[in-house]
Amino acid sequence: MEHYISLFVRAVFIENMALAFFLGMCTFIAISKKVETAIGLGIAVIVVQTITVPANNLIYTYLLKSGALAWAGLPEVDLSFLGLLSYIGVIAAIVQILEMTLDKYVPSLYNALGVFLPLITVNCAIMGGTLFMVERDYNLGESVVYGMGSGLSWALAIALLAGIREKLKYSDVPDGLQGLGITFITIGLMSLGFMSFSGVQL
């Protein structure tokens, strides 16, 4: 249990998808203008990550990995070259289901997210979670914990940035830094703050 807790804490704070690896920056900057919308997208990313990382773990373990098809009498077959294609297919399917669900049950959030909801499919933070899982050879339990933690890390970062940007509207920002300029500086300062967790040994 201790191992899973440390993996979760490491995924959220020490290896933050947005502020340590700078993944998913396009959506991160574009949707962080309002806290409400940012939290909505953050929850969507958590859901997608929590489902896709374990799902891709099963596909990799039982179909793609070298020797994975031993159960089918094909121990020599290595389909790992199909990895990226398979992972993108799973991510696209999950995002499509999420999109249809939001359209039916939470149309206000669906409209607020606009084009950025289907763009979760190509959000490199989502793909990054799966690729880190494969690289680190996580088992199914670790994949579930890591998927949830990495999704939460991105959601936490975008919610924090949205809160700061809402406050910045009422600040006296120099003309040359208004808009994206001050946003990039803010992200840099947030990243420095999260760097303080890098010395924590779990």
From Swiss-Prot:
| Signal peptide interval | none
Known catalysed reaction(s)?
a ubiquinone + n Na(+)(in) + NADH + H(+) = a ubiquinol + n Na(+)(out) + NAD(+)
Query: What's a Pfam family in this record?
Result: Rnf-Nqr
* GO process terms (BP): respiratory electron transport chain; sodium ion transport
Transmembrane segment boundaries? 11-31, 35-55, 79-99, 114-134, 144-164, 180-200
According to its UniProt record, where is this protein mainly located?
membrane
Enzyme class, first EC level, given as a word: translocase
- Keyword Cell membrane included in the entry's annotation: yes
* Coiled-coil intervals: none
The record's annotation in NCBIfam families points to:
nqrE
Q: How would you summarize the oligomeric state and partners of this protein?
A: Composed of six subunits; NqrA, NqrB, NqrC, NqrD, NqrE and NqrF.
Q: Can you say what this protein is called?
A: Na(+)-translocating NADH-quinone reductase subunit E
Natural source organism: Stutzerimonas stutzeri (strain A1501) (Pseudomonas stutzeri)
**What taxonomic ancestry is recorded?**
Bacteria, Pseudomonadati, Pseudomonadota, Gammaproteobacteria, Pseudomonadales
Gene name per UniProt: nqrE
